[in-house]
């Protein structure tokens, strides 16, 4: 008997609903359970999603449910919480931790033994506490981390160079937030080092400063939120891409929030790094070379992670 790919999503707001739609449109799962603090919303989204069935790559079953239904899933996506205009992601911490405490221990107690994928901000910190609350191995608790930020960097570099973003390899590292850094020194365009490409194409980079491009990536979320009150499409695709890599055992290198255990000289917390993603979740973290500026920026981001983990611990949710 073929195995059914089952996904649960907790938190069906702008982000959760678009994660659901992205996974359905890409044929990532066969069964989906939606859960929200407002049950009527989850039910309505489930019906709305079912109305897309005749347009999907293959048949899928979508329904609303609770803890017992979620416990039977292979992957649970956590997208609870909200972000308002001008709010720093780290200012969401207490509310986000209270939200995950309300269901993570219960779904594990009910028998869930799959993989958690966290989107809820501040994602690196929340992912850390999802692991603490669940007691799961570090590889089976993953955050979307700098996955979307890296996609934004690739888009911006594509706009500057007029080259397809799919042949650009470039990563944002560290916090999914204001201290993230662009790893320009390891970036490539179809195998050509990005910094070498800059030197041989000075006309394309006239007046372009890498520090400005980096800040543009960081500002993108706030610009979107300022205009439409939320981000949803990009993160929906980021989540879908990550879940697909798990289900298909793709062993793709994807930027995500992964638990450091000596990599990059750090241990004991989650942050945005490239990792090999397969059926076991995070199979391996890849360590990219960092220049002096990038190393300092990464160290600063790690300091932020450690600081806010301590803040999170002060709330005594575990």
UniProtKB/Swiss-Prot annotation:
GO molecular function, one term: L-lactate dehydrogenase activity
UniProt-listed Enzyme Commission number(s): 1.1.1.27
Residues at the active site: 176 (proton acceptor)
Reaction(s) catalysed (UniProt annotation): (S)-lactate + NAD(+) = pyruvate + NADH + H(+)
Pathway the protein contributes to: Fermentation; pyruvate fermentation to lactate; (S)-lactate from pyruvate: step 1/1
UniProt keyword terms in alphabetical order: Cytoplasm, NAD, Oxidoreductase
GO biological process: glycolytic process; lactate metabolic process; pyruvate metabolic process
CDD domains: HicDH_like (cd05291)
GO terms for cellular component: cytoplasm
Chain positions recorded as substrate binding sites: 89, 121-124, 149-152, 231
Cross-referenced InterPro entries: L-lactate/malate_DH (IPR001557), L-lactate_DH (IPR011304), L-lactate_DH_AS (IPR018177), Lactate/malate_DH_C (IPR022383), Lactate/malate_DH_N (IPR001236), Lactate_DH/Glyco_Ohase_4_C (IPR015955), NAD(P)-bd_dom_sf (IPR036291)
Residues engaged in binding NAD(+): 15, 36, 41, 102, 119-121, 144
Cell compartment(s), UniProt: Cytoplasm
Pfam families hit by this protein: Ldh_1_C, Ldh_1_N
Principal subcellular localisation of the protein: cytoplasm
Function: Catalyzes the conversion of lactate to pyruvate.
Matches recorded under NCBIfam families: L-LDH-NAD
PANTHER family found in the cross-reference section: L-2-HYDROXYCARBOXYLATE DEHYDROGENASE (NAD(P)(+)), L-LACTATE DEHYDROGENASE
Record's subunit section: Homotetramer.
Family that this chain belongs to: Belongs to the LDH/MDH superfamily. LDH family.
HAMAP family named in the record: Lactate_dehydrog (MF_00488)
Protein name: L-lactate dehydrogenase
Organism of derivation: Fusobacterium nucleatum subsp. nucleatum (strain ATCC 25586 / DSM 15643 / BCRC 10681 / CIP 101130 / JCM 8532 / KCTC 2640 / LMG 13131 / VPI 4355)
Gene that produces this protein: ldh
């Amino acid at each position: 008997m073929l195995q059914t790919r089952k996904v649960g999503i907790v938190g069906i707001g702008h982000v959760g609903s678009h994660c659901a739609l992205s996974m359905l449109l890409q044929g990532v799962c066969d069964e989906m359970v939606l859960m929200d603090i407002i049950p009527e919303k989850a039910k309505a989204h489930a019906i709305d999603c079912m109305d897309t069935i005749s347009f999907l790559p293959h048949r899928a079953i979508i329904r609303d449910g609770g803890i017992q239904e979620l416990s039977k899933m292979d992957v649970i996506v956590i997208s609870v919480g909200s972000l308002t205009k001008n709010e720093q992601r780290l200012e969401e911490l207490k509310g986000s931790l209270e939200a995950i405490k309300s269901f993570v221990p219960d779904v594990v107690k009910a028998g869930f033994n799959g993989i958690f994928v966290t989107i809820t901000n501040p994602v690196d910190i929340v992912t850390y506490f999802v692991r603490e609350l669940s007691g799961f191995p570090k590889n089976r608790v993953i955050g979307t981390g700098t996955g979307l930020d890296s996609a934004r960097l690739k888009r911006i570099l594509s706009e500057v160079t007029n080259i397809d973003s799919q042949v650009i390899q470039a990563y944002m590292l560290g916090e999914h937030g204001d201290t993230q850094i662009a790893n320009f020194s390891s970036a490539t365009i179809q195998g050509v080092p990005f910094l070498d490409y800059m030197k041989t194409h000075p006309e394309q980079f006239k007046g372009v400063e890498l520090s400005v491009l980096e800040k543009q990536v960081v500002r993108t979320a706030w610009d979107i939120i300022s205009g439409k009150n939320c981000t949803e499409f990009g993160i929906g695709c980021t989540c879908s891409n990550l879940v697909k890599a798990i289900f298909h055992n793709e062993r793709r290198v994807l930027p995500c929030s992964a638990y450091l255990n000596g990599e990059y000289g750090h241990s004991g917390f989650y942050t945005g790094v490239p990792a090999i993603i397969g059926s076991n979740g995070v199979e391996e973290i890849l360590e990219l070379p960092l220049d002096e500026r990038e190393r300092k920026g990464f160290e600063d981001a790690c300091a932020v992670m450690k600081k806010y983990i301590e803040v999170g611990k002060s709330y005594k949710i575990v």
